[in-house]
Structures are given as structure tokens and as C-alpha cells.
Amino acid sequence: MLQPKRTKFRKQQKGRNRGLAHRGSKVSFGEFALKATGRGRITARQIEAARRAMTRHVKRGGKIWIRVFPDKPITEKPLEVRQGKGKGNVEYWVCQIQPGKVLYEMEGVSEELAREAFTLAAAKLPVTTTFVKRSVM
């Protein structure tokens, strides 16, 4: 699963997920892409589950790019532990998603196959998404 090799600090504050994605909002590598239309956070497990669903559907044909990386640690305290005594341990990593962010890209397959693969991937993700094609300038 994806997670940073090393970070400056082990734990982060919660923060707020506001605004739109201006960076990473264009199709840069492939021909087709899955773009987020809602906001939320995607865990490393969800990123991997969606990638596996797409890869299996296209039968290892074409190329897939993952455009998001989980770089935010989420901490949790164990069950039945009272509040206080410091912040909990890092349990998993997430990527915060704003509307407009490109999540995955694909090339080397037909549009129909790409749409089907992205539909399978979208079912694994907690944010609403849409299918987009590279715009020719």
C-alpha cells in the first residue's frame, strides 16, 4: 500500500478540506481519466482496491497512472481507552480530495473499455467521480 517513506513529523492535525483542486486537475499522462466531482478523503487501501479493479478489467492491457498519493496520517486511539494521555497512534494514510482532482489516468485501451474500468474503480471510492477525456488544444 502507498505511504510516505519518511515524514518530517509523525502526526498531523485534522485540518479542513475546502476549495477546489487547481493543481492536478488536467489530464496530463493518459488519454482518459477519472476525475473527482465531490470532496472527501481516500485511504491507501481504497486507492489500491480501485487500481486492482481497473487493472483486472483491462486484462493488463494499456497503461494506468495513479495521480493521487496518501500523505496525511490518520491517528486513532485503541478501543475502550479514556480520553487524554496524548494523541493516538497512526493507523492509516489518506489523500484529501477536492472537486476537480484527477485520480487515475489510462491509455492504450478503447474508450468503452476505459469507461467500464473506471466505473468499477469508482464503486470502490468514497467520492463522486466522472469520466473525462484529454482535451485537444
From Swiss-Prot:
Residue numbers spanned by region Disordered: 1-22
InterPro entries the UniProt entry points to: Ribosomal_uL16 (IPR047873), Ribosomal_uL16_bact-type (IPR000114), Ribosomal_uL16_CS (IPR020798), Ribosomal_uL16_dom (IPR016180), Ribosomal_uL16_sf (IPR036920)
SUPFAM superfamilies attached to this UniProt entry: Ribosomal protein L16p/L10e
Entry's Gene Ontology BP terms: translation
Keywords carried by this UniProt record: Ribonucleoprotein, Ribosomal protein, RNA-binding, rRNA-binding, tRNA-binding
GO cellular component: cytosolic large ribosomal subunit
Keyword Ribonucleoprotein among UniProt keywords: yes
Role, per record: Binds 23S rRNA and is also seen to make contacts with the A and possibly P site tRNAs.
Subunit structure: Part of the 50S ribosomal subunit.
Family: Belongs to the universal ribosomal protein uL16 family.
Name of the protein: Large ribosomal subunit protein uL16
Record organism: Saccharophagus degradans (strain 2-40 / ATCC 43961 / DSM 17024)
